[in-house]
Structure formats: structure tokens, C-alpha cells
């Protein structure tokens, strides 16, 4: 049971980190594009 739950928890943490990095990247790109258009 523990051998199956540990990889699942790791994949969930990996997916969460990828999701957070993706949102951060989108936010940074949105700020850069907004600055480019306003300037």
C-alpha cells in the first residue's frame, strides 16, 4: 500500500508545481505584454 501511495503523492506534487510555474509564467508574460503595449 505504501509503495503505491508514495509515487502517487510525488506525481501530485509534481503536477502542482508545474501548475504553479505555468500560472507564474502566464502572469509574467501578461505583465510584459501589457508594458509593451502601454509603452
UniProtKB/Swiss-Prot annotation:
Name of a matching Pfam family: PsbL
Topology versus the membrane: Single-pass membrane protein
Cross-referenced SUPFAM superfamilies: Photosystem II reaction center protein L, PsbL (SSF161017)
InterPro entries assigned: PSII_PsbL, PSII_PsbL_sf
Biological process terms in GO annotation: photosynthesis
Gene Ontology CC terms, in alphabetical order: photosystem II reaction center; plastid membrane; thylakoid membrane
Subunit structure, as described in the record: PSII is composed of 1 copy each of membrane proteins PsbA, PsbB, PsbC, PsbD, PsbE, PsbF, PsbH, PsbI, PsbJ, PsbK, PsbL, PsbM, PsbT, PsbX, PsbY, PsbZ, Psb30/Ycf12, at least 3 peripheral proteins of the oxygen-evolving complex and a large number of cofactors. It forms dimeric complexes.
Similarity remark: Belongs to the PsbL family.
Stated role: One of the components of the core complex of photosystem II (PSII). PSII is a light-driven water:plastoquinone oxidoreductase that uses light energy to abstract electrons from H(2)O, generating O(2) and a proton gradient subsequently used for ATP formation. It consists of a core antenna complex that captures photons, and an electron transfer chain that converts photonic excitation into a charge separation. This subunit is found at the monomer-monomer interface and is required for correct PSII assembly and/or dimerization.
Protein name: Photosystem II reaction center protein L
Amino acid at each position: 500500500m505504501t509503495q503505491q501511495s508514495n509515487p502517487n503523492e510525488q506525481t501530485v506534487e509534481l503536477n502542482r508545481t508545474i501548475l504553479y510555474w505555468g500560472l507564474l509564467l502566464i502572469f509574467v508574460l501578461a505583465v510584459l505584454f501589457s508594458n509593451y503595449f502601454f509603452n
